[in-house]
Amino acid sequence: MIEIVKLREHGELSSIAAEWFHQKWGIPVEAYAESIEECINNKKSVPQWYLVMENDAILGGLGVIENDFHNRKDLTPNICAVYVEEEYRCQGIAGKMLNFVCMDMKEKGIDTLYLVTDHTSFYERYNWKLLCMVQGDGEPDMTRIYIHKEM
């Protein structure tokens, strides 16, 4: 059975999750480990990390952090590191994950989330709206930032 797991409630998965996100995005494993540990130990609303799991296999995941490496520090918090394993794509997993996280964050008192991406037409399916262009840290080109407000 496929389930969405809140890493805050499953600290035993922190090392595996940090390594998985590192393998998908190439950001140092220590950065993920530190953010996931903060999620588990700090009890603040941000950061948060989530995995989609089937038995012991990670099918996908994402995080919620203050800023996903862009110049608009006022647009916070940001969904980051959205990834679904290739063989599990086109099955609605990303949409379920996004909806779950938006609802979970609303329960924590956060109804507006932002997401930086160069994808077009994917996030719109899940009620995300293009807000503006932002400058990524160290990036030569501007990229899109989307907004989602949970009603």
Predicted regions and their residues:
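Active-site rim helix/loop that mediates acceptor-substrate recognition in acyltransferases
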Residues: 26-53
